[in-house]
Regions:
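TRNA-recognition modules of translation machinery and tRNA-sensing kinases, especially anticodon-binding
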Residues: 1-292
Length: 292
């Protein structure tokens, strides 16, 4: 048998000359999170597949196309984590953190796995730093997460950042938005790519994320989610913006930031620098409920 001397496609070795740089970034992220009152949580690299199906969403590209899923020797369907929120939420419930003083503020720094086309800044194995504030619906918590991310970039000396924020509402007001999107895109369905034609019924908001130039052009005039927010979600978003202004954090509202996973709700944001970004979001309660 020939000696294997090449890493699997979509993975990358971290050599000594780069390891110290990554260690510095990780240490800065950990220290900043601790300064904001967050404590580290570590979860298994694989979970029951159902956890991601329920939390991330059956209709998402992640679940349908990108997960590394297999049956173990006991016949259980197991998935390498494609993101960190679901495992953190499961640990929050299983270990009774939900019964302790709330909110519970945790952070994680994990390897994640998605079967995607490898490209610059996007590999099949990647490292995700995330923070979760469980047990609060306060807009102040959303603003704090944004401030934390901003502080990490400041300490790393990253310049040229642009913060973009949006609100995608709650499941109630988002249902009306989905209807508006379906109506808009249905008129030009034949022009959409094959993938987006499939998204039209099951998850029309994902069309706004499509990288196809034709779909992007069609989406330019699509309804904005902020026009469909209920009163509660509108007030929540207004307060997030007020808190950011009070902390002198510059931002722009971008109604095209939608994020595609089912547990996203209300505030979503991205720090954009060149071709890379740092996304964030609020998780809705259903994603945190116990399995039946």
């Amino acid at each position: 048998m020939a000696l294997i001397t090449k890493a699997i496609k979509g993975t990358k070795d971290v050599l000594p000359q780069d390891a110290y740089k990554i260690q510095y970034i990780e240490a800065t992220a950990r220290e900043t999170a601790a300064d904001f009152g967050y404590k580290e949580i570590r979860t298994p690299v694989f979970e029951h597949t159902e956890l991601f199906q329920r939390g991330v969403g059956d209709t998402t590209d992640v679940v349908q196309k990108e997960m590394y899923t297999f049956n173990d020797k006991g016949g259980r369907s197991i998935t390498l984590r494609p993101e960190g929120t679901s495992g953190a939420a499961r640990a929050f419930l299983e270990n009774g953190l939900c019964n302790e003083a709330l909110p519970q503020k945790v952070y994680y720094l994990d390897s994640c796995y998605r079967y995607e086309k490898p490209q610059a800044g996007r590999l099949r194995e990647f490292h995700q730093f995330g923070v979760e504030c469980f047990g609060t619906q306060s807009p102040l918590a959303d603003a704090e997460l944004i401030a934390l991310a901003s502080a990490i970039f400041d300490r790393l000396g990253v310049t040229g950042l642009r913060l973009e924020i949006n609100s995608i509402g709650c499941p109630t007001c988002r249902a009306k938005y989905y209807d508006a999107l379906r109506s808009y895109f249905a008129a030009r369905k034949d022009e959409l790519c094959d993938t987006c034609q499939g998204r039209l019924e099951r998850n029309p908001m994902r069309i706004l994320d499509c990288k196809s130039p034709v779909c992007q052009e069609i989406a330019k005039d699509a309804p904005a989610v902020t026009d469909y927010l209920c009163d509660e979600c509108r007030e929540h978003f207004d307060k997030v913006q007020s808190y950011l202004k009070a902390q002198n954090i510059d931002y722009t509202v971008n109604s095209r930031i939608v994020r595609g996973l089912d547990y996203y709700t209300k505030t979503v944001f991205e720090f954009v620098v060149r071709l890379h970004w740092c996304p964030g979001h609020r998780v809705r309660r259903r994603a945190l409920r116990r399995p039946d």
